[in-house]
């Protein structure tokens, strides 16, 4: 799922393949790009993850904790496609 495409059917492809194979774990890299930097809210992240759970994903790989040294000026080192959920978040 992406910011502009939150169709549960798209993510259901992965869970359907896992069911056919007999795999119980369905993993998805999650929350890599929900919106622009520093504009995501915890409620938006929860709604996004709820859609993944509805699609049959049962293992979340959270992509959103970028390292930035304390001495780096705000906003620090930011990865272009990651949620910024860290101590520097406004």
Task: Show which residues each predicted segment covers.
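Carbohydrate-binding surfaces of carbohydrate-active enzymes
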Residues: 1-90
């Amino acid at each position: 799922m992406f910011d502009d495409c939150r169709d549960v059917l798209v993510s259901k492809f992965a869970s359907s393949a896992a069911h056919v194979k007999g795999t119980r774990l369905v993993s998805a890299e999650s929350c890599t790009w929900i919106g622009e930097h520093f504009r995501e809210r915890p409620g938006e992240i929860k709604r996004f993850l709820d859609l993944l759970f509805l699609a049959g994903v049962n293992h979340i790989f959270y992509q959103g904790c970028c390292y930035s040294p304390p001495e780096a000026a705000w906003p620090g080192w930011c990865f272009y496609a990651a949620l910024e959920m860290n101590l520097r978040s406004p």
